[in-house]
Each structure stands twice: as structure tokens, then as C-alpha cells.
């Protein structure tokens, strides 16, 4: 009999090519311009600590931080925790920005999230020995990782979570858990997620021992995991992350932010697909499924159901479970199919790289009130200022120390935030609150662009009958009002407030047409309320044109 033919294999260059295309695709996906409001908080605080060689206590950036009384029992503790729990991350972020500029920051972010996806796929590859299962796991992780593509220290948390996962899977150099947690617990408070991994793998080893099948390295695992847990307390807050997680649930300020809302479960999404799909696979493969995978799944799925910001955990555990237990793909992919896979990935890579949002190595300057800040500096204005929450971080970076913030994203004062909410959302109560704080300057935009809601304070200020506030500056991003304009500054007519709202919404639609609700709220709320039917019709038409793209 003739010898059996050798199995056909793909050329040696194909897999490296596929890996390169996948990495380039992910880098392109995660490299949009710098636009997150909280980025500037980390840069400003990091710069201050780097220059002053101390933690930012007392707070140097907001003039309202220590006003009023606490609203819930742990508020002072939470404030102290928020001021110092990510000090190392903020300094490192500042140094990246100072050394590499916007390009360095964008590329660092893209590299961190790409590595998060890549290590997830690598763990699957180590488990299965299957190249394509690992690759698909990395791409599946990317579907959810897009939601964290912001310039915040938490991107390093998710990267370190996968690094820890790899250490626990390899079981080599478990001692690395100790320096990992020392670094991590000073970089960002998300290191508590690493404790979940320690618990899952140690729990698996303990259950195996009870079953009479002890793992060979269980003592080493327990020792270094315990030391890793203790190392998480080597930071300025010690083990403050534990009570802080409960304290956050008491805060109206935290719970008003979208990222702390529960994720919608009535919409099709990659999150639901990965969460439910991985559970189905666990049940289907229950005889093979590792106890650690069950424990990680229920812990991270539970966290993800509590807040949108935790959905990313499913981006790691979902692909890990799915592609660890589904049949290996390489066994069924013939060389022709592997070439087709590479061709498909090439098309996807080309689309990602040529996307308008790929490799935007810049700041989304259109979102920030640079013109208004220049006006304040030009006229040496440093009176107590009321600003919108979304701009607080940027003002810390660009307007401090001349102006300090009323509120910003650090969530430091609950009573001040509630007063802020009254001013921005309820114009009938606004003047009394502004008088209470002695505010002399208002720096405003017209909308909360995620929902499109119009800040009602603008409606009050557009009323010609109110004379306390004068419009002194307006462009397509911001408006500045003052009680007493400086010499040489001629107030603008109140009607220009509405012109400012129109200009802001038009500019937003040009840059971010996927969020067109400012046009909707002008058309179906503000202008009908003011009796301006022609303007209302115009903005409804703009909304329908943009929404229908």
C-alpha cells in the first residue's frame, strides 16, 4: 500500500501575517482622538503631584471641595480615597503626555487595550493549542474593549488583569503576583478585580483537594496568592478599596453617572452574546469546565450586571470560556479556508485603518472651551466660577490656577454636586443656589450630548428680563456670563444665548453625528417651549436628516 499522504499545512508566513493584521486592526480600533472628560483630571493631578512631590491633599483644584456637610456617612472617607487611590497612574499618565504629547497618549491607550485582547487570546491558545481559537478570542474581546478606549488609568487595570490571568495559568513565577499587586494597587483602584482571580484559582485548588485530586503546586499557589492579596494593601489607602466599593453605592453623585448605571438587558449586544454564550458553553461542557472558570464567570458576570463600567470583565472571561471549550478550529480549517480567513482579516484591517477614527493622534479640541478659557485669561478673571461637570477636568488642566472648578469628575462633595444638579437641571432654583455660593462667573455649554438634554439654565439666561447675568463671551463651544464684566468688556445681547445653542449643536452634529439628540431637544422641547416654531421645525428637520444617515 502506498504511504498515507501527509496532512496539508499552511505556509510558515501565514500565521505571523494574520497576527500582524489582527494587531494593526485592534490598534486602529482603539486609537480615536483624546476626548474623555476625565483624562484631563488625571493629567492635571499627575502634573501637580510630579511638581509638588506629594498627594493632592488638601484638594488644590476645586474651590467647593470642603464646603457644606456630608450627605452620607462615608462621604469624607470616599473623598479621601478618591484623592489618592490612583496617584501612580496619574503621574505616569502625565509623564506619557508630557513626553509623547497627544500621539503618545493615544498610542499608549491603543497598545494597552490591544494587549488586553491579545493576552486573552494567548491564554486561550495556551489552553487549546489552537491558533485560530486564540485569535477569535482576542477579536471577541475587542468587541467589548471598544467601550473602554479612553485615556484613563483603568485601561492599565484591565491589562494587568489579563497579565495576572496568564501568571495563574502558567503557574511559573507566581512570585510576580507580589510586585504586580504593589504596582497595581497604587496605579488604580480596580486591582480588587485581581483578588477575584486569586480567589477563583485558589478555590479551584481547594475543591480539587477535597475531591482527593490535589494540584501539585497548590501550596505555592496559596502562598503567593496570599502574599499577592496582602501586597494589594501597600498603597496610601491600605485596604480602603473594600469599604470604598460599598460607599460608592450610597452616592447620588456616582449613581447619576451613566457608567454606574446597570447595563440594558433588553437590547442585542456583544455583551449579552458573550455573557450568555459563555454560560451556555459552561453548562454544555460542564464535565470538562474548570472550577476556576465557573467561579470567575459568576463573579465577573455579577459585577457586570451592577454597572456599565464593569461590562469589560465579560470581554475577558466570555471569550476565554467560549473558545477554551468550543471545538478547536484549526482541525477543521483547511489551508484554503485559512487563506480565506487571512483575506477576510485583510479587508477588516483595511476598513479599520482607513476609518476616520483610526490613529487620530490628537486632542478632540472641538469639545473643549479653549476660547472661553483664553477670554478668562486675557481679562485676568479669577472670581468664583460655576462650570458644568463635563468640563471640570479640562478646566483643572487648562484654566488652573487662575480659575478653580465648582465641580469635576473626581466626585468629592455630595452636597455641592446636588446644588450643581439643581442649577444645571432646574433653572427656577438656579439663582438662589448661585447666590448661596457667591458665584460671579458662569462657564456653560448648552447640552448634555449623550442624551441631548438642554441645560435649562440657558433658558433663564436667554430671558431679556433677567439682568443679573451678562453674556460676555460666546463661540460654537461655550458661553461665559458674569455678574459684573471687567472694564472694556461690552455685554452681548441675551438673544445671542440662543444663537450660541444653535452654533453648539451644529458643531456637535458635524463632529459627532451619531449623537444627534441635541437637535431633537431643540426641536421638540426648547423652541416649542419658547414659541419659536420656525426654529423648532428647522431643528427637527436637522435631527431627522442626521438620525436617518
Report the location of each language-model feature.
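Transmembrane-helix signature of polytopic, membrane-embedded enzymes
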Residues: 20, 120-143
